[in-house]
Amino acid sequence: METNKQIALRALTGAFIDRDPNVVEHFTANYIQHNPTIPNGPAAIKDLIPRLPKDFSYQQGMVVAEGDLVMVHGRYVGWAPKPVIAVDIFRIEGGKVAEHWDVMQEEVHASDSANGNSMFSAPEEK
């Protein structure tokens, strides 16, 4: 049996790394989307995938899970004019992604940060 973490990561990997439109099989039929630029429903995810720019990339960072919620810290390049750091929050229901929220912010490099820290560290960078 897959964990909620594995389900959320499969959704992110399928959509943004593999660019597999069949990833929507892992979303509920009444999938709720809270990103204001993406409609509700798995069809919106399927439509989004082929529209990703050729130079688009996604890098997963920290993952935290509690109950039916999974939060993933990630770096999106090509989503916006500059790289974006995001926290994606997924609600899992019946082994599928049922709901999604995200908070996105343009990346500020450590050299430009008041504290000298980067906004993102991939697991392999720790």
Question: Which ranges hold each PLM region?
Answer:
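C-terminal and inter-domain tail/linker signature
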Residues: 1-126
